[in-house]
A protein has these predicted regions:
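Serine-esterase "nucleophile elbow" of acetyl-processing enzymes
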Residues: 1-54, 59-71, 76, 240
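Alpha-helical cap/lid subdomain in secreted, periplasmic
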Residues: 31, 57-260
Length: 260
């Protein structure tokens, strides 16, 4: 009989798909796998370009019902919304209205196939965007304006927080605030507390977002390090403080046990 490893699943859009890559010397997926080595398999189910409507359409196929022969999902990290927040224009197709986004997120974190695994669900807010950089790139791509704005994207992040608040079994991971705080810390002279945010036309400065979000949307290695720092306290608490020789949680025995 096979003994499949429990899983930590990363479910979302390109922000999680790209977490498998090594960027600026850091890979989020690799860091999580190292933290969970021999105890959990880290599975990447990030789909570039997807919104919550796409996720709902395929969720039954992505998350099968648990069975004796299939792995149990112990942790589920969900990060969706960056594409839902795309402005509806003749040149765009990804927009999901805010209220529907909320319903979709709620349906995902309460899907019966997922709940049957009884995972710890970590719902990550979409990060901020650098609207100044996005406008440059989007105009060059033929769009009439930036297809994402800081204000609209922030409203989707707040909705993700609300979904977590509404569901006691869901943990909120506030990536939006953490990335913005990091960007401000990198360039404090370009932001005044209470004033327009970095990356907005009203501010006029990209600040630290220019480093953390090189194309205005996708994260660099330092931004993924921020996300790792947010996830880490919720994953592996039961073994990270153990002595190095303690193999609690290993699915298969340590070689010393076999040698004995």
């Amino acid at each position: 009989m096979a003994f499949p490893y429990p899983q930590l699943v990363l479910f979302g859009d390109s922000l999680l798909q790209h977490s498998a890559e090594t960027l600026d010397g850091f890979s989020l997926q690799s860091a999580l796998q190292t933290r969970c080595l021999r105890r959990l398999d880290v599975i990447n189910r990030g789909f570039s370009g997807w919104n919550t409507a796409n996720a709902i359409k395929f969720i039954d196929q992505i998350f099968p019902k648990p069975s004796d022969a299939s792995p149990r999902i112990k942790f589920l990290v969900v990060l969706l919304g960056a594409n839902d927040a795309v402005i509806p224009l003749p040149t765009t197709t990804q927009h999901v209205p805010l209220e529907q986004y909320k319903k979709n997120l709620d349906a995902i974190v309460n899907h019966p196939h997922i709940l049957a695994h009884d995972p710890k669900i970590l719902l990550v807010t979409p990060p901020p965007v650098d609207e100044i950089r996005l406008k440059e790139l989007n105009l060059a791509e033929g769009h009439p304006c930036a297809v994402r704005t800081s204000a609209i994207s922030a409203s989707y992040s707040e909705t993700a927080r609300q979904v977590a608040r509404d569901n006691p079994h869901v943990v909120s991971i506030d990536l939006w605030t953490a990335i913005m705080d990091k960007a401000i810390a990198l360039t404090p002279d370009e932001y005044t507390e209470g004033g327009p945010l970095l990356g907005t036309p009203d501010n006029g400065n990209r600040g630290g977002l220019a480093t953390l979000l090189p194309d205005g949307l996708h994260m660099n290695g330092d931004a993924y390090r921020v996300l790792y720092g947010l996830l880490k306290p919720h994953i592996g608490e039961e073994w990270v403080s153990l002595p190095v020789e303690d193999r609690t949680g290993y699915l298969f025995p340590d070689w010393r046990e076999l040698a004995g």
